[in-house]
Every structure is written in structure tokens, then in C-alpha cells.
Amino acid sequence: MTDYDVVIVGGGAAGLMCAMEAGKRGRRVVVIEKGKVPAGKIRISGGGRCNFTNIHCTPNHFHSENKHFAKSALKRYGPNDFISLVENHDIAYHEKTLGQLFCDNSAQDIIKMLLDECEAVGVVVKTSMTVEHIDKNETFNVLTSDGMISASSLVIASGGPSIPKMGATGWGYDVARQFKLKIVDPVPALVPLTFGEAFIFDFRALSGLAVDIRVQCGKTSFDEALLFTHRGMSGPAILQISSYWRSGMDITINLAPNRNVFEELKIQKEHQPKQEIQTTLSGIIPKRLALYLCDHSGVSGTLADLSHKKLKIIADLVNVWRITPNGTEGFATAEVTRGGVSTSELSSKTMEANKVPGLYFIGEVVDVTGHLGGFNFQWAWSSGHAAGQFV
């Protein structure tokens, strides 16, 4: 049996951050990673350049059953703290849009930074190793594929089941259940939405088309880009709203935000009555989409031929298009997982399980889900840092 102070299961963003922070405190730390190399999701994120944080990050950018849970960790270790770390390692970066920070070169820069920090404080990182069993007496005994490891603190940083091709599973939830902790049902988040067969047939004609929209589900809305795909809808707007969508709910799409299309059509009818409705709409939204909506609504002809009632029908499809998804593309393409270990079971200051001293949960395995744009990485850094001060 090998003894450490801290065993961290999961060598991703949260796990490595926790490891280096615990190591700075003189703790003997081992990270167990089942993959051949650590930080797999960092490597593929942001098109290989890693959207490592967002300078506008606040607790309001996170979804959880307890909307206040993330406040403590984010306050103690925020975007500026991680940016300072990046700058100390001379990693070049840039702001792409909406506060999203990316590496100029490669996500590998972030991975090397984390591993260098871990190495500097004596953290041991073991790859291609799986956990077979865990039990707790005075310490945690972790049976791995390479023998038994004992430690006073056990950190679960194994993520959620999103992107299973990277080896992602819901293993961390099994550990939580073993210790009688509540789980908020995990579902795919930041994921494309799908529609019925009739819609799929229609959407194929729009595949590849992108348009800036406002999308709303319930009381939540986002102004971002929509991308039509051969399977349904994707793009930042849809990925964002997917975290708030539930089965059976409508989403409302405004294809021309900040424009009153009905009023514009009435004015255009007065000035150019012989203009075809498709032509008029093509001046407001992309032509392919204008043709689709006219076909979809059965509204066609010149503006002079169309009553205000008909104009209102087509205008509402532009400004208030209500549509009901029949599902999502699932964990296979989901960027993150919504749900996880209930925050009611954890200390927001330390990430320690209230009922199991020495057991910690950090990162995606916890019921804290960020918006698209670097927020989930910031939660990984913040929660990992928080636990690293106490393990």
C-alpha cells in the first residue's frame, strides 16, 4: 500500500488545479488519471486553443439548484487570478469575443503550465490507471489497477458523462451514491437540439446557415448565433439555451432582434406594393431562411396581395418563432453535464462533503454548470483551488 495525504481521481482542469494548490501547502498528492495522458478535454477545447476563462465571469453565469453555491469559490479565485497564472508562464492569449480568452498557440500551453506547476510541488500524476474500489476507515483506501493507495483526503474530479469518446463517464456519481450523497439527475448541456422528422426534412435545406438571433426558454434568453444543421439546430445560441430547456418546453426564436418586422412589412407594402414577400423578407433575414419561412407558413405573393393578417403570420415567424424540440443530441456531443452531486451535500467554501469528512467533489461532477464561453473552465479552476486549500 502507498500512502499519500491526498488522492485526486481525475487529471483534468479541476483535478490538476487542486493538486498544485494542495502541493503548495506541502501535501503529498497523487493524481489518478485513467487516460493515457492527462487533461484530455483541455486539449480539444476551443478548437484546440482552449477558451480557458471569461473576463466577465460572475455567479450569474452558472446554473445550479443552488444559484448561490458558486459565489464563494469564484470570489476567492476568479478570472484575474487564473490570467495572472497564465501570464506568469508567458502564455500568449487573446480575447475572441464576449470576454472569451483563448491561447494564441495551443491548449497544450495550458496543460504544460498545470503539469509544470504540479511537478514543481512534487505532485505525482499517474496515467492509464483506473479505480476499482474505494472504502473508508480512518483513511480512504483506494484500490487501483496498480495496487492500493491510502490517503486522508479523497478528491473526486472525474467530470461528467459528456463527450464519452474522451472516456467520460458518470463514475463520480457512483462514488457519491456509495457515500449516500444526493445526485441531481445529470442531463446533457451546451448541446444541439433536435426536432421531429418533418422538421429535420425541412432543416436540411437550411443546413450550414448561420444567423444572429435572440432565443428564449422560460425566462432565460441569449443573443447569440444560431446554426442550422442537417439534424436540427446548433450554434452558441442553441447550446446556451439547451442548459435551460426541459422536455416538452417550447423555445422562442427571434430571427431579427430589435426589429419590428410586422411594422416594417406594413411600411414596405405602402411603398413597394408589387414586391414579393420573399424579396422583402430577404432584406431582413438570409434569403434561404426567408424562402423557408414563406413555404412553412404558406404565405406567398406580392405585398399588395397580402392582408395585414397574413403579414402578421410571417412577421411572427421572424420575431416570435415558437418551436418545440423533441430532444438533444445527448452526451455524445454535449460540451458539459447539467446536474451532478447536489450542492446541498457540499461546503461551498471547501467542496468537502458535509457528511463525509475528507471527501471532496470539484469541477463538472458537481451540480454547477456554466454558460458557453470559458465559464466551465473557470468553475474548474475556482472549485479546484477552493478544495486545494483544505485537502
Predicted features and spans:
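N-terminal Rossmann-like FAD-binding beta1-loop-alpha1 element of flavoenzymes
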Residues: 4-31, 387-391
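Short hydrophobic core segments
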Residues: 7-9, 131, 149-165, 176, ...
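Glycine-rich FAD pyrophosphate-binding loop
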Residues: 23-47
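Glycine-rich active-site loop/strand segments that organize a redox cofactor
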Residues: 47-97
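Feature captures the FAD/FMN-dependent oxidoreductase FAD-binding
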Residues: 76-153
